[in-house]
Amino acid sequence: STRYSRKTLPKQYSLHDAVFNISRSSMLAGVFLSKRWNLLKIAAEDKIHQDKRMALLPALFAVRKEALKRGALMSVLSGSGSTFLNICYRDDSSKLASSLSKKFGEFRVLELEFDNTGFNIE
């Protein structure tokens, strides 16, 4: 749960780690605007929460390693850890999903398309 996961996080962070994460989140926005997908892995680096929360479910470290090895452009923990997001080229998605499903059968793997319109009210 989010509440339990938050307990693994420190109450304070170093200025270095905070600046690192702010720079990466800014870079991530730039990557999506410029479509420089080769920079996604760097833009997804984190020093604030991912590794601390992933320690609650250590298999996620192997998931991230395998996903990046199998073609993911970025592999990140989303939120408190109920979701792990891997972004890859469309041509690699089935192969990546299949590989992760076979190797990590205890997890549910969903292969989804990007939604470039988001939420709309008509």
PLM features: residue spans?
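Anionic-ligand binding region
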Residues: 1-31, 40
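Glycine-rich, charge-dense phosphate/pyrophosphate-binding loop(s)
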Residues: 32-122
